Amino acid sequence: TRLVYSSSPNEFSYRNHDKKENIYDEDMTIIGQYYPKEKNRSGSFKDFHALQEVYYNTLKGDRFGLNAWYIHSNRELPMLTTDYGNESDFENRQREETFRGVLSWDHLRENWKMSAKGGYVHTQMKYDYKRDAGNGVMTPMTRSRSKVNTFYGQSEAEYYIGKEWLFTANVSAHQHFVESRDKNIIRQDGNQAIVGYSKGRVELSGAASAKWQPNDRIGMSVVLREEMYGESWTPLIPAFFIDGIVSKRGNIMLKASTSRNFRFPTLNDLYF
């Protein structure tokens, strides 16, 4: 079990080289300029982290594990160094709460092994931006809320044939649910509107590889991979790798590879 808490007011003085203040004479003529000395007062943070790991080894080639992480963060976002406003006139704050839980199983034998894991991830982000409207009352300008829930599973296997061949395969599945809302959008008619989105998507990934190492100086491998996002499939993605030892003195090696690549837009690209 591990528990970590950290916090800081994050207040410090500094010379702001992104601003220039004018020096005036009695006739209000600029006779000089200088970089002001300021104090950062809006970058405080409070972070709490908790980690719990539990493992059980049967001593017969099987191991079971439980891992859980929790994060709670409350952070102020400081003003820009080019902002000439007063830091007491606004509040810019982001809060995060994340939980990750994983169950795992590892199975080991003389010439093969396999593993499986499944988990759940929950993340909630809250962002608030408030500003003094001039009457001493902090008025909400932005009130953004987002939630991400992900369920996933993964399985891997390795099989050895002698010392020359190694075959591997792995498959993974993710189900994402994303919800984002901004509750402080003012329409032209003066009424408040709630805008955002609620999306879900399944992502699958599978790969298989074969590695051949005829001796201790050279090795070659071929990998085939394919992925699915939503209702679309990527083309088959092949790759070939080769590496060899040119000289054992100094461990000089040569490596070469060729592959095809394909990148699909993630939910982060599309919506976050």
Model-found features: residue ranges?
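Short acidic-glycine motifs
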Residues: 7, 73, 80, 85-92, ...
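Sequence/structural signature of outer-membrane beta-barrel proteins
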Residues: 8-10, 73-77, 123-130, 176-183, ...
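Transmembrane beta-barrel strands of outer-membrane/channel proteins
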Residues: 1-7, 66-72, 116-122, 169-175, ...
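Flexible, surface-exposed loop regions and adjacent strand-edge segments
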Residues: 8-9, 16-24, 71-72, 79-89, ...
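Transmembrane beta-barrel wall of Gram-negative outer-membrane proteins
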Residues: 1-7, 19-74, 97-109, 162, ...
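Surface-exposed extracellular loop regions of Gram-negative outer-membrane beta-barrel proteins
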Residues: 74, 124-126, 230-232, 236, ...
